[in-house]
């Protein structure tokens, strides 16, 4: 078995099921010589069950212009906004609070995100979620 030579690793955040050749995807992949439409079709097929979720994706481009990609869980801030039905966090997080997260919601987000975190303990993941929530102007009960 021969190992393909990696020439580039591209990291993007793309809404699930909505990849298209427009910027930022097209220029990033075109510069690496990747078939842009091929990536868009594969990504959209793989993420059709997560429409609209902002998904981090890591694209590995090989010397023969083939690629593989790994999709990750949405960022914690996106999960919090989705849970509380918010458009954005507070512009002044220390003064203006825009919502409240319960411990059950924090735990659900932490469990979902732990797959991508380098954390073993649920308590550590919960603290990270709580910190992100506070920086967005959201109270944690």
Curated annotation (Swiss-Prot):
Biological processes annotated in GO: translation
Keyword Manganese attached: no
Pfam families: Ribosomal_L11, Ribosomal_L11_N
A Gene Ontology term for the protein's cellular component: cytosolic large ribosomal subunit
Disulfide bonds, paired cysteine numbers: none
Post-translational modification: One or more lysine residues are methylated.
GO molecular function, one term: structural constituent of ribosome
Keyword flag RNA-binding: yes
Subunit note: Part of the ribosomal stalk of the 50S ribosomal subunit. Interacts with L10 and the large rRNA to form the base of the stalk. L10 forms an elongated spine to which L12 dimers bind in a sequential fashion forming a multimeric L10(L12)X complex.
Summary of the function given for this chain in its UniProt record: Forms part of the ribosomal stalk which helps the ribosome interact with GTP-bound translation factors.
Protein name stated in the entry: Large ribosomal subunit protein uL11
Originating gene: rplK
């Amino acid at each position: 078995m021969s190992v393909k030579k990696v020439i580039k690793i591209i990291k993007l955040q793309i809404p699930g099921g909505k990849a298209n050749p427009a910027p930022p995807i097209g220029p990033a992949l075109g510069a690496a010589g990747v078939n842009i439409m091929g990536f868009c079709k594969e990504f959209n097929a793989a993420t059709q069950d997560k429409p609209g979720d902002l998904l981090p994706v890591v694209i590995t481009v090989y010397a023969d212009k083939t690629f593989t990609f790994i999709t990750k869980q949405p960022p914690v801030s996106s999960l919090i906004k989705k849970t509380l039905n918010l458009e954005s966090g507070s512009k002044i997080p220390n003064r203006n609070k825009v919502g409240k997260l319960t411990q059950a919601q924090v735990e659900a987000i932490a469990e979902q995100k732990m797959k991508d975190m380098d954390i073993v303990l649920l308590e550590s993941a919960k603290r990270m979620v709580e910190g992100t929530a506070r920086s967005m102007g959201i109270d944690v009960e």
